[in-house]
Amino acid sequence: SSYGVTYVKDESELLDALEIAFECDEKALVEERLVGTEITVGVLGDPPRALPIVEILPQEGSEFYDLDVKYIDPTLVHRIPAAISPKDYHRAEEYAVAAHEALGCKGFSRSDFIVGEHGTTILETNTIPGMTDTSLFPDEARHAGIPFSAVCDELIHIALEGAEE
């Protein structure tokens, strides 16, 4: 949920950012920032299928899709389907389903990507994506014509099948 995540513009900001990160955990990950279009791809079902892709539109005053944008001021502006090329759209769907399967996810997941000059890069896979009123996964399902109650029914069915095995 972006706890402890900070965007630094130059090396002078790195130590302060690491202090914030170490308040959340004893380990920290430092990565190069990728420039491009931020998208997220929900995966639902067994067999898993990609849901319509969400494009996360940049918010004024926010460097990235951070904790404040997600939960404190949840006025996230996003577009479904994402305005990316058909090639990038298909690639992101394939990567999201492949990540879901490779990680052994059951029922649902949501993978985040940056699409840019570098290609389509997966940032992370959320194995238990948010399911609140402001969460992206239920919105993706709605755009696929799947009401929230049907998503819950499908997840319960998958869990019960797994319990029988």
Predicted regions and their residues:
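Short beta->alpha junction loops/turns
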Residues: D10-E11, D46, F108, G130
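Phosphate/diphosphate-binding glycine-rich loops and adjacent basic-rich segments that engage nucleotide
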Residues: S1-K9, A17
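Glycine- and other small-residue-rich loops at beta-strand/loop junctions that grip anionic moieties
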Residues: T6, E31-E32, S111
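Short beta-strand-to-turn element immediately C-terminal to the catalytic PLP-Schiff-base lysine
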Residues: T6-D10, V43-D46, G116, L123, ...
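Gly/Ser/Thr-rich beta-alpha loop segments that engage phosphate groups in nucleotides
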Residues: T6, E38, M131-T132
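Phosphate-binding site of ATP-dependent enzymes
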Residues: E11-E94, T121
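ATP-dependent carboxylate activation and anion-phosphoryl transfer catalytic cores
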Residues: S85-E165
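Short, flexible active-site loop motifs that bind/organize anionic cofactors or intermediates
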Residues: Y3-G4, R79, A141
